[in-house]
Amino acid sequence: VPTENVEAGRAFGCNPLQLLFKVELPLAQLYTQTPLNVPIHVIHGRRPGPVLLVSAAIHGDELNGVEIIRRLLRHSSLNRLNGTLLAVPVVNVFGFIHKTRYLPDRRDLNRSFPGSETGSLGARMAWQFKTQVLDRATHAVDLHTGAIHRANLPQIRADLSNEDTAAMAAAFGVPVVINSVLGEGTLREVAEAQGIPVITYEAGEALRFDESSIRAGVKGVLNIMHHLRMTGPRRTRAPMEPHIARSSSWVRAERDGVFLPLVALGAWLRKGQLIGRISSPFGGEDVTIESPCAGILVGRNNLPLVNEGEALYHIARFEEVREVAQNLEVFTSDIERGPGLTGEPPIA
């Protein structure tokens, strides 16, 4: 990978003992023969330690992670860093340019790992990213949002059978953790297969900035760095103990029509509670939507026009739903009312 030393961190107020490099990982060319690279920020601390990879926009339309990394790189705690931070604001540069989840051939980059040197565009990109970036890491955090028109409550998804991964999930500091299987071809699957603990942070909606989700993400990554002893003493209070979902499921539309949601993300749902309606734009009776179980609403469709079978609500089940709801209220209040960690004005 060709590397270029850029101003030894002065742009980010870095300590002289700290080295910041900007690496350009070459991928491919556009039709115009314009080279396309993935920018990677490499920050070496004052002492040896873990190598933490923080990646975003592996789906090109998931933008909250891009802003999380931008703010992270400006945070003063990096002046006292131990180990190395690898920050990749945009993995899927093709999708990012075109504001889409996918690659030009409609493949999903996060289903293309470990990839190959001679396969499709997605396979080649995955191979490059794995061999040149992921393989250098000891730990990883992958930043995501919901899909287009679908919003996620800030949550961690991780394979909790791995003790190191479970510890990272707890350290991140959001109230909801979903024990998630490792999907075939995902960055998480290939990382865990080679012994790299990795968690996925899911928050917000594609093609939208959400200030609360961004703040929680910045704070969460800093919590991970503290957990790995990459940074000094904590300046904020320790994160609350998260709640692990026993399971989760989607509520789907029973007919086509206009979807009228009646509950917000993070809502505490009771079994049988009215949570939405589907009406016809041409009149007639509404179809009511009831919660099939008690739980917390962790995902929601924000598009009013739905087809039969379309996913509407994602509900996570917990042993102590009341306690989860109370902790979510405290967490949301702290994130929304507290000052931003980088001193920047909030996105309206």
Q: What does each of the following model-derived ranges do?
A:
Residues Q18, V23-A348:
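Structured catalytic-domain cores with a bias toward divalent-metal coordination
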Residues G9:
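The alpha-helix within a helix-turn-helix
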